[in-house]
Each structure stands twice: as C-alpha cells, then as structure tokens.
Amino acid sequence: MKFYNREKELNYLKTYCQLDPNSILFVYGPKSSGKSTVMRRVIKELEDSNIVFFYYNLRKYATYSKEEFLRVFFEKSEKKYLLNKLELNLGVFKFGVEENFDFNNLKLNDVFAKINESINAVVEDGKKPVLIIDELQKLKNIYFNGGKSLLNELFNLFVSLTKMEHLCHVICLTSDTLFIEEIYQSSTLENTSKYYLIDWLRKGTIRNILKEEGFSEEEINYCLDYLSLPYEIVDLIENKKLGLSVEETIRQWINIEKDKIKYLIDTTDLDEEELYKVLSKFKDKIKISYEKEVKKEEMKYFKFLIKNEILFYDVINGIIKPTSVKKWYAIREILK
C-alpha cells in the first residue's frame, strides 16, 4: 500500500530511536490507523544508520503458546543476532541462540539471558539496538515454569533494558486500548513509559492525497466528511477506477458497518437497550470525555464496544470515540 504523508509521526519516532534509551514507548491508536506502516517506514529510513532493529510482528500469527513465542523470537545460529528471514526486505534482526540450545527445557531466566546476550552483542559491535514488538498483547496468556506470566516478566526486563541500563529502546505497538489501559494503570510501569498516539489522518493530508490522485474538488469536499484511515483512501481510489462513484463507495461502507454493529448487538447476552443507550452518546458528537460522560454502571457496555472495535478509548487523553469516522456515521444511522 502506498505510504501517505505522516511526517509528524515519522519525525517523532525516528528521533526517539536515535535518543539514548530511557523509557518503554507504547505506540497506540485505532485499528488500521497506520501504526505498523509508519514503524516500518521508520526502519527503512534509518537502514543506513548504526541502529539494529529487532522487529517482531505478532499479528502474523493467530495464537501464541510458549513454544511459538520461542520459535518466533529466537533462531539457532553461531551469531548472537541475525537477519530475520521472514522480513528480509525490511532488514531487521532476530535474537540468536547456539545450535545445541534446548527449547524444551527452558526457564524464563534462560530466555531473558539470551535476549540480554543478543542486545549486549549489538552494543559491543558499536551499534544501537531497538526492540519493536507489534501487537504485544498477543503474549498475554503465556506462562512459564512456576506459572510466571511471560508478559509481566517481559515488562520487568524492558524496564531494566531502558530505564535502568539504558541499553536498548523498546517500542510496543497495539490497537488494543483496554490493554493500554492496563499498562497505564500498572504500578510496575509507572514513570518508565511514554505513550504516542497514531490517530486518524488529518483532513489536510487527505485533501492533498485525493487531489494528487485526480479527484475533483467536489469529490474531495464530499469525502472529507467521511474519510479517516489510510486503507479507506486506497479502497476509494480502487473503486473509482472500477467505476464506482465516491458516494456509492461511502454508502457501501456505512451500510456494512451498520450491519456489523447491529449483528454484534443482536448476538450478545448484554442488555441491548443499555448498549444502544451508550451508542446514543455519539448521536450528536464524535467523541466524549471518559471522566465527564461515562458512568460506572456503563463501563461493561463501553468495554464490550471497545473490545469489538466499535469504539476507541484513548486512555492517555481521556477520550472515547468511534474507531473511524465512517463508523460514527453507521452508529448515527442505527440510532435513527
């Protein structure tokens, strides 16, 4: 997919990667807002620098077990770190372990020792290590010997690598905002983390893209009320080439989103009336304040809609809104 203008986000992340490590960075935002695309662009633009990127895209795998985690993160080799064969075009690395390393009888301390060895090897080579994990929350339900949570222990390791030893940047990407809320409230990560939002595309950016792609001023003005995510622009451009007007494409989007929301509500055991009551808060405005407009007894309905990606909870700024502008229009139509 074509990379669209994200200079502000690119500059922030490129600069962050070149600073001395001092915190864990959580990059969050609505689903499909372009987090992974921006991060991959950062890696490409810094490929000639002295940075060694360890990049793990966990969205490629449906479920995770202890064994799968080890297979994804490590590779047997004489080297302490080596190119990731699954991401050769990106030039990123994996942690290396010796050929006779026994994956079947591992303790968590053994795993962390190998991660530390790889990172220290990069530093000894005069380079800067940056560890990036995309959709980190997929590791939530993995436990090692003694019932230790992999994710909780990883956070302790990340704090050590960044805040304490200043050895390695750790950047975690996620669209799971309930997961971000857990992290934000965690005492373990207090004063050790930064949060960066990659949100909807700005209207000026959308206008420039559509103009560059040959859309008329009338078409652009119509689209600006509905577009917010990069993939929507791609879909709009493709559909125009296939003979669909922008009005037809956008109407299709809203109808599909409306049906998805209705089906979700129709098939849950939660109180239908209460769910619609929560959605009605968005009838006349696209975002609400969590502090001022969400009651305690409504939280389970909000969490259900957030978990199912109808709503997006920006925990850092205390805002709840639909995951996209087209989703907002679908909500409003359902409420008619």
From Swiss-Prot:
Pfam families found in the cross-reference section: ATPase_2 (PF01637), MJ1010-like_2nd (PF21690)
InterPro entries documented for this protein: AAA+_ATPase (IPR003593), Archaeal_ATPase_domain (IPR051667), ATPase_dom (IPR011579), MJ1010-like_2nd (IPR049081), P-loop_NTPase (IPR027417), WH-like_DNA-bd_sf (IPR036388)
One term of GO molecular function: ATP hydrolysis activity
Residues that coordinate or bind ATP: G29, P30, K31, S32, S33, G34, K35, S36
Gene3D superfamilies the UniProt entry points to: P-loop containing nucleotide triphosphate hydrolases (3.40.50.300), Winged helix-like DNA-binding domain superfamily/Winged helix DNA-binding domain (1.10.10.10)
Alphabetical keyword list: ATP-binding, Nucleotide-binding
Signal sequence, start to end: none
Ranges in coiled-coil conformation: none
Family: Belongs to the archaeal ATPase family.
UniProt name for this protein: Uncharacterized ATP-binding protein MJ0625
Species: Methanocaldococcus jannaschii (strain ATCC 43067 / DSM 2661 / JAL-1 / JCM 10045 / NBRC 100440) (Methanococcus jannaschii)
